[in-house]
Amino acid sequence: MAAQDPQNQKRRDHNVWSLPQRKASRRLPRKENSWDEFRRVIPLVPLHPRPALDVAPPKVAVLMCTMQGQRFLAEQLNSIATQTHPNWEIWASDDGSDDHTHSILEYYQEHWGEDRMSIHAGPAEGSTANFLSLTCRADINTEFFAYADQDDIWEADKLERAVKWLQTVPRHIPALYGSRTQLVDERNQYIGYSPLFTRSPSFGNALVQNVAGGNTMVFNRAARDLLRRAGDQVQVVAHDWWAYQVISGCGGRVHYDAYPTVRYRQHDDNQVGANISLGARLVRLRLLLKGRFRKWTDQNIQALMSIKPLLTDENRSVLDEFAASRNGSMLQRVWGLWDSGLYRQTVVGNVALVLGALLRKI
């Protein structure tokens, strides 16, 4: 059951998301079991027939990267199977799992068919490289593309909402959809929500912050073609942040949906968590002071410089001014942020941004 649409609500705090209590998910075993034992507890959801071609909505390629994902993969696959937008196909890229991840993918492929699920070997160079490699595959030919992690749960209308907005954008314009997320624990029990962002997405925001998690992102073919031109060998911090930077920087359109379309599972094996607690924020502050964010910015700027001809004239100027000001005096560093129009989505985030500039940590 999807979350209640916040567009019909008047309040904008965390209490706006009034959801019914969800039944706890049945986790698949964490310890190693034989495949026969493991398969017996997989709650596979059968598919509805694919729509007839003369009435079929546009096809979405679901780009899913996996690595040691046996605990939650089946639940994620089932949530894709129950989408109200029925025309999708999964391209799964496994980075060398030695648990039952690959067997689970093959099990679903056997029941759903190869036209719904194709399985490929990833580059085994980490999650970011795996997603970039999958994004740049020339043999994926659909109108829309959606990133998918291996351990989340999609709300039933996730693809429908994304495609509805993407279809308002002319096909030749790169377009990226992302949304807020609901946070759940290992058993799919409510924890909270990701921060609600209210400022418009832009390249000035993308240079210093990612506006939406990759697990919510859906984009059109023009955006995918742009990411392919950037290539899969760029050294970037994260594939989703990179997508936001490239698409906004090259004049594309980016839409942030305040409605949470994904239940973002928080667990010990997460490579990246939501980081909304006070403790997590203190950790981020410590990383900022230790120079981690500056290293990330170095990496992203270097990658953006490699595609500089693709950026709009205005955004090339923004990139140049930001890159130059980072190595200037204290006044130049702060002025560079202001003059180039860089911002984060929250007051606290902007305070941290200015602090980082003052301390030469951005």
Regions found by a protein language model. Give the residues of each.
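C-terminal subregions of glycosyltransferases and related glycan-biosynthesis enzymes
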Residues: 50, 228-232, 236, 242, ...
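Leucine-biased recognition of intrinsically disordered, low-complexity hydrophobic segments
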Residues: 19, 28, 44-47
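Nucleotide-sugar donor-binding/catalytic module of glycosyltransferases
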Residues: 38-278, 358-361
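Charged/polar low-complexity intrinsically disordered segments
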Residues: 4-9, 23, 31-32
